[in-house]
Design a protein with these regions (language model features):
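Gly/Thr-rich phosphate-binding beta-strand-loop-beta motif of the actin/hexokinase/Hsp70
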Residues: 1-10, 111-127
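ATP-binding/phosphotransfer module of carbohydrate and carboxylate kinases, centering on a glycine-rich
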Residues: 1-45, 54-57, 75-85, 100-107, ...
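Short beta-strand-to-turn element immediately C-terminal to the catalytic PLP-Schiff-base lysine
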Residues: 2-3, 97-98, 122-126, 130-132, ...
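Short hydrophobic alpha-helix segments
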Residues: 12-14, 64, 133
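A short acidic/small-residue loop/turn micro-motif
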Residues: 15-18, 68, 137-139
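A charged helix-plus-loop insertion that forms the helical arch/lid used to bind
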Residues: 60-69
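Generic enzyme active-site microenvironment
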Residues: 88, 96
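Active-site glycine-centered loops adjacent to acidic/histidine catalytic or metal-binding residues
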Residues: 90, 116, 288
Length: 292
């Protein structure tokens, strides 16, 4: 529960088991009810941030991490919670939270890039979210990095997310492990693929493991180039970075920073402030609430 100043009054978390729409709606409903009970204040509306393409009000077109297509999540949640629901892309929500009460305070033009399980970005231009004609603008994770390349959860091939998103970094690390191609990865995860994380991949690359270095370097290069190109196109006042992968993989983050310095347009990066997201995991929920 968030007030109009962006302060969290109460919070509740619930572990997500089954990922079908009804199960997710019920999980969110239980967590929301607990947060409302803890806050003890009236709530006018509900904001929901989802890692999904949301081309129309309340409808998810594609949610790669959940395997969803064409799900009216907004209407389902409104029926469950009995309150108006605004459904927005998770990075749009995070960008709005950072703009209002985080690292973007006082700025009018932001580029927000998060790398976690996937790759996402959001754009604030002249103080407003830039979402495009179909509501799916700023989908950095789904620009084509390697046309015809690795399969992405969105159903297409060669997306940036398929190379640099956390889930896909782990998938590539597991492929190396299965082929016996990375002794360092095998040692770091005790030969258990289920234990692999992007941090293991970066550590193996740091140790000089050839195949881990190849995968990590490709991800870093593609991500850095994509962010640098966005800086050139958008000329933001601030670039805000966040997400678990960038937070816990400093080598990847450093490559992004170097890429912006080396490859973005000189005039576009003049005066650019590069900042870490201030609100951490709360940026999306605060932003979604403030947008509701």
């Amino acid at each position: 529960v968030v007030d109009e100043a962006g302060r969290i009054l109460a919070a509740s978390r619930a572990a997500l088991g089954e990922r079908s729409p009804p199960a997710v709606v019920e999980c969110i409903g239980r967590a929301a009810e607990e947060a409302l009970r803890l806050a003890g204040v009236p709530v006018r509306a509900v904001g929901v941030g989802a890692a999904a393409q949301i081309p129309s009000e309340g409808r998810i077109a594609v949610a790669p991490n959940l395997g969803w297509r064409d799900v009216p999540l907004g209407a389902l949640l409104q029926a469950r919670l009995g309150r108006p629901v605004r459904l927005v892309n998770d990075l749009s929500a995070a960008a709005w939270g950072e703009l209002r009460v985080g690292a973007g305070r006082g700025a009018q033009d932001l580029l927000v890039v998060f790398v976690g399980s996937g790759v996402g970005s959001a754009i604030v231009a002249n103080g407003q979210l830039l979402q495009g004609a179909n509501g799916v603008g700023a989908e950095l994770g789904h620009v084509k990095a390697v046309p015809g390349g690795r399969a992405c959860g969105c159903g297409e091939k060669g997306c940036l997310e398929a190379y640099a998103g956390g889930h896909h970094l782990v998938a590539q690390a597991r492929e190396l492990l299965q082929r016996g191609a990375s002794p360092a990865l095998a040692r770091l995860c005790a030969e258990d693929p289920a234990r692999l994380t992007p941090v293991h991949l970066e550590q193996a690359a740091r140790e000089g493991d050839a195949e881990a270095t190849r995968v990590h370097a490709q991800a870093a290069h593609l991500l850095a180039l994509a962010v640098a190109n966005q800086v050139t196109v958008l000329n933001p006042a601030r670039l805000i970075l966040g997400g678990g992968v960038l937070t816990h993989c400093p080598g990847l983050r450093e490559r992004v920073l170097q890429g912006v310095q080396d490859w973005s347009g000189r005039t576009a990066r003049e005066g650019l402030l590069v900042l870490d997201a201030e609100l951490g995991d709360d940026s999306g929920l605060i932003g979604a609430a403030l947008l509701a």
